[in-house]
């Protein structure tokens, strides 16, 4: 009997799972919030811009060390039977280190410098740099930009590197290596300096055939090309391959065998496809958490405007992986729950239920459109298909009779409409969607929301029993790297998670949602394209004030 470890680094917490490689059984698991959380409003008592989202990399090591120690001890499994470790991580979450892979934010002189810290995926401080990259690529007719949806996001690696170059050159001077935090964990485990094709391909303008797009970087600033060449470029390991064995010192520290193999890191949402068993084209998978990623696989590379990228072999060898997404989903619902009136909070507490459960109870019998509300779910910008992190959310139709649960439902519907925009974009560019999978903690807990999605999309929705699908997917890659399975497909078939339930659309609800979706699309186009300056002008007052 063999086992593999899957370590899942999410936005707010980390998870370490021990998985049976034969049947996918979860033998032991460890879940812990990051000690320093997400650093958003202040750093060590100093105020930071509202567009910033940072983390302390020491939290990642804490998760790994405490988690592995716990699952080995709790499971009583012989460490010699643990054949591999897989890592998934939010992305693009980037880290700046010295030549020994020590994060520069640990240097005393940079303790209070936000640019020394990990830049989390939802850090939007590099929006000006992203715009410059985009405009330069368009002016120079860089046709390969179509592989990235004809857009550049401030969430990606290169804009974040430019941000540090422009605003904190002293950090760049002390930095030897820049990498995805997922690559950093893999390198710490193996004492190597490699990069995953998944992270580079989706977030750093790197392609297997051509490497980095220095043609663009040179036009921006020759110094940028040199930074990428000296600090980012490294040997690339593809998903499905092995990076190597655990470093001897790390094996001793973690209590694992020195023969344990380590796989390259995979982006967290992408790992979910493996965890739920989506291995084919014509299947769209929604990985739903603080944000939502909409993933598809295809044999061909299509240039789909507004998506986040397409990379060959980033999930399944020989297939192109496509990613689109929404920047605020779980975060948005949490925001709405925190605004609930005290009477709702008290009622939920008295009935021993969450505010979410109470609001779901209040809306579950409403018909689409009953509240008279419609919302734009851009509270953390719009990733797809507008690719504009500077957009903000709106709600329309409020009256003096509007109740808090009506607002909640409007936001549930808004995220479903946003998903439909993405699905239609895939379909318009020759990628048919026959099946829709939903995975993550939210679908598992919120059947009301899933009913809304099924009827908005007008598709059968397959909800997976997969609150921890990324960790399972990471463990699958660990199993492959450790030789427990001959291929990713074999490992997926053996270890994937089961279906929880399925929902079929209802004709009357579908028809009503078609009317609402037309209104959503009209507002989407007005405030996203035609009159986007309205929101941005208001936001500029906030930035300047």
Curated annotation (Swiss-Prot):
GO terms for biological process: L-arabinose catabolic process to xylulose 5-phosphate. Gene3D superfamilies: 1.20.58.2240, 3.30.420.40. It catalyses: D-ribulose + ATP = D-ribulose 5-phosphate + ADP + H(+); L-ribulose + ATP = L-ribulose 5-phosphate + ADP + H(+). Keywords: Arabinose catabolism, ATP-binding, Carbohydrate metabolism, Kinase, Nucleotide-binding, Transferase. The keyword Transcription does not apply. It is an enzyme of class 2 (transferase). Its EC number is 2.7.1.16. Pathway: Carbohydrate degradation; L-arabinose degradation via L-ribulose; D-xylulose 5-phosphate from L-arabinose (bacterial route): step 2/3. One of its GO terms (molecular function) is ribulokinase activity. GO terms for cellular component: cytoplasm. SUPFAM superfamilies: Actin-like ATPase domain. Pfam families: FGGY_C, FGGY_N. HAMAP family: Ribulokinase. Belongs to the ribulokinase family. This is Ribulokinase. It comes from Staphylococcus aureus (strain MSSA476).
């Amino acid at each position: 009997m063999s086992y593999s470890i899957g370590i899942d680094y999410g936005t707010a917490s980390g998870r370490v799972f021990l998985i049976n490689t034969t049947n996918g059984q979860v033998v032991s698991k460890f879940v812990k919030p990051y000690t320093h959380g997400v650093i958003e409003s202040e750093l060590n008592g100093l105020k930071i811009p509202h567009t910033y989202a940072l983390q302390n990399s020491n939290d990642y090591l804490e998760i790994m060390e405490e988690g592995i120690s716990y699952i080995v001890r709790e499971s009583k499994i012989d460490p010699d039977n643990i054949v591999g470790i897989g890592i998934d991580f939010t992305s693009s979450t980037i880290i700046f280190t010295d030549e020994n892979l020590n994060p520069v934010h640990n240097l005393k002189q940079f303790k209070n410098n936000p640019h020394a810290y990990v830049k989390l995926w939802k850090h939007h401080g590099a929006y000006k740099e992203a715009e410059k990259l985009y405009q330069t690529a368009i002016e120079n007719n860089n046709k390969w930009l179509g592989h990235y949806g004809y857009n550049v996001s401030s969430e990606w690696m290169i804009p974040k590197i430019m941000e540090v170059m422009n605003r904190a050159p002293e950090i760049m001077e002390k930095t030897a290596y820049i990498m995805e935090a997922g690559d950093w964990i893999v390198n710490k485990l193996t004492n190597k300096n490699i990069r995953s094709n998944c992270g580079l391909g989706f977030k750093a303008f790197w392609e297997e055939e051509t490497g980095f797009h220095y043609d663009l970087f040179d036009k921006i600033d020759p110094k940028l090309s040199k930074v990428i060449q000296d600090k980012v470029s490294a040997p690339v390991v593809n998903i499905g391959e092995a990076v190597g064995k655990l470093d001897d010192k790390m094996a001793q520290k973690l209590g694992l065998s020195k023969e344990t193999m380590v796989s390259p890191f995979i982006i967290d949402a992408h790992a979910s496809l493996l965890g739920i068993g989506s291995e084919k084209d014509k299947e769209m998978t929604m990985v739903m958490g603080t944000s939502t990623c909409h993933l598809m696989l295809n044999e061909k590379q299509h240039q789909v405007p507004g998506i986040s990228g397409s990379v060959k072999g980033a999930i399944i060898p020989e297939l192109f992986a496509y990613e689109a997404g929404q920047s605020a989903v779980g975060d948005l619902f949490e925001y709405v729950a925190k605004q609930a009136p005290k009477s709702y909070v008290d009622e939920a507490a008295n009935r021993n239920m969450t505010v979410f459960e109470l609001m779901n109870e209040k809306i579950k019998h409403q018909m689409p459109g009953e509240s008279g509300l419609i919302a734009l779910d851009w509270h953390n910008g719009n990733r797809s298909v507008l690719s504009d992190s500077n957009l903000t959310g709106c709600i329309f139709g409020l009256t003096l009779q509007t109740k808090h649960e009506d607002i909640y439902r409007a936001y549930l519907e808004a995220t479903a409409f946003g998903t439909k925009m993405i699905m239609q974009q895939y379909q318009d560019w020759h990628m048919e969607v026959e099946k829709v999978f939903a995975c993550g903690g939210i679908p598992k807990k919120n059947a009301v929301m899933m009913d809304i999605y099924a009827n908005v999309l007008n598709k059968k929705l397959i909800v997976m029993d997969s609150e921890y699908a990324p960790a399972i997917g990471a463990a699958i890659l660990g199993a492959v790297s450790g030789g427990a399975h001959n291929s990713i497909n074999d490992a997926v078939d053996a270890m994937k998670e089961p279906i929880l339930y399925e929902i079929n659309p209802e004709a009357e609800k579908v028809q009503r949602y078609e009317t609402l979706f037309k209104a959503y699309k009209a507002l989407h186009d007005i405030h996203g394209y035609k009159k986007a300056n309205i929101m941005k002008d208001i936001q500029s007052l906030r930035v300047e004030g």
